[in-house]
Curated annotation (Swiss-Prot):
Signal peptide: none annotated. Pfam families: Lactamase_B_3 (PF13483). It comes from Pyrobaculum arsenaticum (strain DSM 13514 / JCM 11321 / PZ6). InterPro entries: RibonucZ/Hydroxyglut_hydro, UPF0173_UPF0282_UlaG_hydrolase, UPF0282_hydrls. Belongs to the UPF0282 family. This is UPF0282 protein Pars_1056.
Amino acid sequence: MEILPVGEESLGVRSMCLYVETRDVRILFDAGVSLAPRRFGLPPHPRELERARSVRGEIVRLAQQADIITVSHYHRDHFTPWYPSVYMATDGETYKKVYGGKKVLMKSPADLNWSQRRRHYGLAKALQEAGAKAVYADGGEWRIGGTVIRASPPLWHGPAGSKTGRVIAFAVSDGEERLVFVPDVEGPVEPEPVAFLEEVKPTVVVVGGPPTYLGWELERALQRLTEIIDIGPHTLVLAHHLLRDLAWREKIEAVLQRAEKRGVRVATYAGLLGRKDELLEAMRRDLYAAEPAAAQPAEEGIDEGD
């Protein structure tokens, strides 16, 4: 199994895009990228805008190779929109380059909030225009040669009852490795993501960690991460919300110690690529201080919760 990180906070953008290739199938998980419209009262620095364009180019390139593309939920950093956006590095045709003719395993709208349901409607229409085959994936399973792809039931995007709605996780097994992609569970804080992992018994876990930068109470998230380590993967990739905090390692020190004791490698997307973390969003204030730049006009319709 080949695992290639594409975009994520350690690579300078908001994303969890990941490319996975087995002997039988090529999958691009969550083909999206975006930037926080405001952080520390500042809009994206030009270096962030440049990085978003770079990641978008890689998403388009890998999408054209992929057989399957996923949409775990309808936040803008997890799918390619059908309209132009500076913060998502799209024009009006980008979605066709990403989704055109592809099989898209996507979150069902059945239990979505109004905001995500509206985005689902727009994306579903765009997928039809692009000639994609959209499949609601919640709880489903697909066998392609010797590879099995499995989707979880809906999981909370953070604590139960969260206004940010629900997501789905994906597991890929090729008979040697078992990877589970668990986006935006914000820890996790609820037991259901851990239960899904216990069923799959993954060798590699890619999980959206807790948003420590928002001042969260961490105890439940740290406990869940410890439970994931105890399942016994050889690699735990911590991603997304957690890496919007420059001090994230210090705040999860107990988890890192547990992983070391159990022989579990803890990595970031950048680390998997052999690169240093570049937490550009968390560095935004410092970037403006070191490299002063005129603030770009705010992009309408984009909010912090996306």
